[in-house]
Structure formats: C-alpha cells, structure tokens
C-alpha cells in the first residue's frame, strides 16, 4: 500500500517547467507518454544560447543525437503536469491525500517509521510505513530539520522571474526551444515558451549584481535586466507581463545523507543544483525510478537497512556530479560552449548528452577538455545513507 501526502490542493503553481530528452523513459514507465503527446504542452526540440549582444547560437537539436521518441520533449505548465502525475498515482492504486501537512517523522530510535500529519479538518494523525520517501522538493523537509542541508560552495545565485503573454516565439520547431540568454557578470535569462500563448522568463545571477544601484523590488530588477540582452528585449516587446514577479535565492544545496533507516530522499529534497540546464525535473523523475526499484527490492526481501540503498545513492550522486561540473564550467568567465566545441568538435555529442540528461556515463574526455578552459569541482563527499552504528559493526 502506498500513501501519498500532499500539503496543497492540486492543481497548484510550481516553477521548473522544462523537460529534458532523458525524461522520456521515466514518463514511459509511468505510462504517461500518450497523455503527454495528447496534451497542449509545447513540444521542445532544442536548446540555444544567446550572447549579450543578442546573437543566437546554432541550436543544440536533440534529433542529431537521439531517435525520434527521445529527441522531442516538452515545455510544461507545472500545475497541469503535476496534476497529471498525481492522477496517475491515484489511478494506479496510491491513496492520495491533499491539503494534508506533514508535521514530523515518526521514529523508533534511529529508524523512521512513518509520518505525523495535520489533516484538512485540522486534526492530527499518524501513518506508519516500512519506508518513508521524502519528496518535499525545495522545502527539503528532512534535510532542513536534521541539519543535513549543505549549501553548494559556489552556486549561490538569485533568480527573479515572471510570465509574459503574447511574447514573440521563434518559428517552426524552434517555437518550443529553451533559450539561455546571457547578461553581464555571467548572469542569464531563461526563456521557456508555454501553451496558452504564455512564456516563462527569468533572470539568474549573483545577488550583488542584481541588487546593484540599490534595486530590491523583483519587478524593478527584472525590467532593468531586460535591457541588457537585445534578444530578450525584442522577444518580450510584443508581450505583456502577467504582473506577478517571483524571487528566490540560495537555492543550491546538497543533503549530507540520502536517508537513514526507514527513510529515503528524492529529487529536490535530496539536492538542487541550478536552473540553468533544467536538470531539476529530470533528476526528480530519475530519482523516482531509482528509488522505486530500490524500495521494491527492499520490500521483496523485507530488508530496509540503509546499506541496501547505497546503489541508489551512488547512481544519483554520480549523475548530479556530472551535471554539477557542467554548471560550474558554465559560470566560469573563461568558458563557453562554442570555444569548447570549436577546439574539440568530437565532443559536441558529449555536451549534448549531458545537457539532455544522460548523466550517468563516463565523461572523462569531456572534463579533461573543459579543464583547458576552466577548473572543475571535485565530487562532494555527500549523499550516502546514514548507517546506524549497530549496522557498521
């Protein structure tokens, strides 16, 4: 039996709207490909980069590397996409409760045995389980309360975003492309076309850059930064902001552990890197598949000791570290993808693979080439299960 506890009533707003090609297999496994194809979600075939002078690069088309199924993905409206996922879980037998807040974890010594919740009628209840999965996203329920949450030493950015209606789109299959448009100081805009003639657009940079000149209001910061990239300025000129502006900061973190006895962390509850390559949804879906397999094996053997989940942790951390290296290079002032692929044209496919979410492969050749332009970080020593002393004996 599976109990799925949601704090809010769906559908609800959420940021993080661009899928990567390698989300295809998790969606296929969930049985959602036909629903995705029948949806109004904008089809995404590529990602492109735009310099500060407004000049767009040749797009990275996914069909140069992958078959037709994988090469086309989607730009999603999270309220609709997440509702689809929730309904799918319910239709497959999960007991889904909404408007229900998790107040704490139930414990028997070091072991997590379930959750304590506040129900819609404001009463409290306890639910026991062989294993609890923390999918709380950026709230990072467990990592925050257990003081496992560790900020990334370098990725301390600020994001400001809004939505435009009627903004310009490129033509043909480029209509749904994700665009990364640069502003000074290694800041950048995302530009994500959505259905209903909407565009998600935001700027990401260091906080001291965005708040220069004393600006603090998200709208003022956003409107000023538009003028620093001609492509963004021209594409937004025909549209109109919905009027809602959002801001978040210091969002990059890693959990010291992926869980403990009776508990496993998934997706953003385990780690969030940076929005630049839209890896959040991909890693969330990937961790869901990995965790499902690991938990199923644990149920079959009736063994939930933390060491059983070391393979889950290792696979997920290896993928995160590969993406993290690419993110670090992106923010280095001495690095850009054009220089890398011009010098090493044979590695263009490797870059596309990593950008597409194929993160669990050997990228040694790519990282050696990146080192010619910028340093890359060592792997962080985080993310394995927390093993009780009695299990270590």
Where are the language model's segments positioned?
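Glycine-rich FAD pyrophosphate-binding loop
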Residues: 1-15
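Short beta-strand to alpha-helix junction loop
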Residues: 65-88, 211-217
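C-terminal helical "tail/cap" subdomain of flavin- and related membrane-associated enzymes
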Residues: 293-393
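A short, glycine/Asx- and small/polar-enriched loop/turn
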Residues: 45, 53, 106-113, 259-261
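Predominantly flavin-linked oxidoreductase catalytic cores and closely associated redox partners
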Residues: 87-236
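N-terminal FAD cofactor-binding segment of flavoenzymes
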Residues: 12-54
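FAD/FMN-dependent oxidoreductases across multiple families
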Residues: 209-294, 300, 304-311
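Helix-loop-beta segment of a Rossmann-like dinucleotide-binding subdomain
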Residues: 57-76, 114, 204-208
